[in-house]
A protein has these predicted regions:
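Extracellular lectin-like interaction modules
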Residues: 1-218
Length: 218
């Protein structure tokens, strides 16, 4: 199924599931309109999607913001793969807790807001990639920890933006756990710390870990 939006964007207030056990693919092709999904994706009984693709076209006007609630649960994937955003996407907001696919995940935007409490992004031995279109950051909400887990196999973790916490509020530093199993971790930001701003514990697990700049903790 492919949905194409224009300047008006698209908003989904309910859950989105595949026909049971059919793993139907879903593409939402937004231009300058925002896309918002406030219900969970792929959490119905045998309702996981196939490929989930949202706003990936690299068109000049494709700048709409994207907001997503959960994809899957902590024990069941909500999609076979996840590809969201492009280099011109304004802000990509992940407001849920679980983002689980069996296959690879690619997230791209000028800025990322992770507003859910203790977000977990996980795959089954497949890559997780965060790309930024400009000088964006992945900003965690106050007291919200981030875990990215690609399973015990060779799923790589590659992150171009800085991962940053939020000062103020309850003012508990945010913890970061990146576990690539037997895969590799690359934190690619240059010119500023790869992880910084009100960050507590940082745990990195992988065969090879490449840091292109500093890590700063509180």
């Amino acid at each position: 199924l492919t949905l194409t939006t224009g300047g008006g964007g698209a908003s989904f207030s309910s859950t989105i599931n595949s026909q049971a056990s059919q793993a139907r693919a879903l593409t939402i092709a937004n231009t300058d309109g925002a896309v918002s999904v406030s219900g969970a994706i792929g959490t119905g009984t045998n309702g996981a999607l196939g490929a989930l693709i949202i706003g990936t076209a690299e068109a000049a006007g494709n700048t709409g913001n994207i907001t997503l609630a959960a994809i899957g649960t902590d024990s069941a994937a909500g999609a076979a793969s996840i590809t969201v955003g492009n280099s011109r996407t304004g802000t990509l907001t992940l407001g849920g807790v679980e983002y689980f696919s069996t296959g690879a995940q690619t997230w791209e935007s000028d800025d990322f807001n992770l507003t859910g409490a203790d977000i977990t992004i996980q795959t089954t031995d497949s890559n997780v990639t965060f790309q930024d279109g400009a000088a964006g950051q992945i900003v965690l909400s106050d007291t919200a920890d981030l875990t990215i887990d690609t399973g015990s196999g060779a799923g790589n973790i590659s992150i171009a933006p800085t991962i940053a916490g939020t000062t103020g509020g309850a003012n508990r530093s945010e913890d970061i756990t990146l576990d690539a199993g037997t895969g590799n971790i690359e934190l690619l930001n240059t010119g500023a710390a790869v992880i910084a701003t009100d960050i507590g514990d940082v745990t990195l697990t992988g065969t090879t870990i490449s840091l292109y700049d500093n890590i700063t903790t509180t």
